[in-house]
């Protein structure tokens, strides 16, 4: 099974920001459960523009964070459902208002611990499904060998 192309985009953005493979796998394990890496999915499965109700995008941003995504898209003159825009917004959050969560994730040593830390401090999901996120992170970790290649 190959890694979802959207997951590759997110992984490369995170690698460029200095995240390790274990950290990247933990983040991606969460997004696998949140959205299957679909940047245009609304909570409940409807695909399209953000509705403002429930989560949106690969990170399932809600409330003020979804508003932040939409405003960020306007500033960048991009579609809020664009995978590259959302990857940039993820880094924007991790380097800004969610820096504490980013630092916590970076303190983890395994994909499973990274997944748990990202869940508790960044996603803050109503239904955690911690074990499933950790299992997804472990599976994804095994598919991140491309990050070891020069130029990636």
Each language-model region and where it sits:
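A charged, amphipathic interaction segment
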Residues: 86-144
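Extracellular cell-wall/glycan-interacting regions and their flexible linkers
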Residues: 1-28, 128-152
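Short, functionally critical alpha-helical segments immediately adjacent to catalytic or ligand/cofactor-binding
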Residues: 21-38, 119
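Residue-level detector of well-ordered alpha-helical segments, enriched
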Residues: 23-27, 57, 86, 114
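Low-complexity, intrinsically disordered/propeptide-like segments
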Residues: 31, 40, 88, 147-150
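Hydrophobic/aromatic-lined pockets within catalytic cores
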Residues: 19, 32-36, 95, 123, ...
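Peptidoglycan-targeting cell-wall enzymes and recognition modules
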Residues: 2-9, 16, 35-110
């Amino acid at each position: 099974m190959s890694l979802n192309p959207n997951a590759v985009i997110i992984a490369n953005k995170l690698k460029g920001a200095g995240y390790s493979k274990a950290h990247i796998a933990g983040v991606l394990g969460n997004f696998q459960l949140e959205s299957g890496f679909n940047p245009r999915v609304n909570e409940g499965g409807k695909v399209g523009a953000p509705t403002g109700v429930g989560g949106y995008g690969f990170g399932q941003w809600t409330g003020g964070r979804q508003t932040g995504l939409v405003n960020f898209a306007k500033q960048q003159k991009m579609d809020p459902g664009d995978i590259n825009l959302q990857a940039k917004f993820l880094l924007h959050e991790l380097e800004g208002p969610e820096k504490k969560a980013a630092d916590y994730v970076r303190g983890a040593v395994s994909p499973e611990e990274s997944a748990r830390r990202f869940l508790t401090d960044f996603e803050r999901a109503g239904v955690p499904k911690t074990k499933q996120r950790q299992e997804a992170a472990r599976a994804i970790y095994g598919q991140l060998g491309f990050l070891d290649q020069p130029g990636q």
